[in-house]
Amino acid sequence: MAQEVPTFKLVLVGDGGTGKTTFVKRHLTGEFEKKYIATLGVEVHPLGFHTNFGELKFDVWDTAGQEKFGGLRDGYYINGQCGIIMFDVTSRITYKNVPNWHRDLVRVCENIPIVLCGNKVDVKERKVKAKTITFHRKKNLQYYDISAKSNYNFEKPFLWLARKLVGNPQLEFVASPALAPPEVQVDADLMQKYQQEMEQATALPLPDEDDADL
């Protein structure tokens, strides 16, 4: 008997145009094996990762653009075991809407591990700076800068979620999944600067007023 691969439903949410579909399509096997659920208008991408404890899989639910027409149906969230909320660092409104996505996610899925991702850090005109990204600290989420088009930090959200779901901080990915070739390059020095800014911002006390710095 082939051993069943542990599989987790991952709900991917965020405003339209933040790069969710671009992000999930980077994983080539998942893109090749995706399934469309017509009743919900959802594409499910099975993203496999090889870890030091064997293989595991995330069934990533992607909205196929429905969020542009308002909220998502509960069927999208039901049985979600983990989540990624995505915003676009070049668009302040997409960050401002993060609390709405978080609220919808936890209303149905309750206490699941969630990663907040700021996408498009390859774009020079960054609008949402490290010091304004505080929502994850208030809600105990993990945060990563990512760039879907360059594959920058692609694996980070999945590794963090896998460790939480399996309950083992020693879990590592031992082989990289096949990813689509980068369409853009990130500036390594700039990424390091962003990383330092994020670390410095995390050391600061949280602002009292939620929208004071938006």
UniProtKB/Swiss-Prot annotation:
GTP binds at residues 15-22, 65, 119-122, 147-149. It comes from Candida albicans (strain WO-1) (Yeast). This is GTP-binding nuclear protein GSP1/Ran. Found in a nuclear export complex with RanGTP, exportin and pre-miRNA. SMART domains: RAB (SM00175), RAN (SM00176), RAS (SM00173), RHO (SM00174). Keywords: GTP-binding, Nucleotide-binding, Nucleus, Protein transport, Transport. Belongs to the small GTPase superfamily. Ran family. GTP-binding protein involved in nucleocytoplasmic transport. Required for the import of protein into the nucleus and also for RNA export. Involved in chromatin condensation and control of cell cycle.
